């Protein structure tokens, strides 16, 4: 990337939260859906907030173990909050619609990631999709698969195997320059990564990026960062960890491909 530099975050202030337990939250799975935020707890409770500060348990919800993300509304396609539910000891896909009604789906495949995955919303062929990449399965295996859904209750395996990106959790994924970019993460040996892969076919195949688009030498390998592309085509990377047990990094990195600088 061109114009890459590091910032120490400034102008941030601590805010108090209400209604959440002190532990047991899967914060990395916090998801925005239909103008509200949702986050699951390890005991199966799903919490909801309209302002990010005041939270309450979602009433009449099943035992939600994991939140996978949300599917946007399409022309002839309803939106959905995609989750995984504990159904009498077995994991199943469930989706919640805008009316907060729950729809049961398929059983979760043994190779499907439940934690440590990255997710991405995208549109293709007049449909809206949600994709997961990498992560860790319920039986504690780190994977290098991508899965996609249009409804949150049926998921299709998009990519796997040695020709894909290497196995990792906590990678970053974003849609940038008409491609999907997958950056970094932490592998099964707890080694942080800083490699970059790209996909030009909606996550079906991935290739390691050459030296034309690279991260700076003083950018530490990391996983579990947040990534946002802003209106000026800057890629912003927030925080992250250098191992699964390390403290969060207090850093903001941003950069962009020079030819994507907006014209004035």
What do the PLM-derived regions correspond to, one by one?
Residues 35-39, 75-82, 128-132, 178-183, ...:
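Entry beta-strands of beta-propeller and related beta-repeat scaffolds
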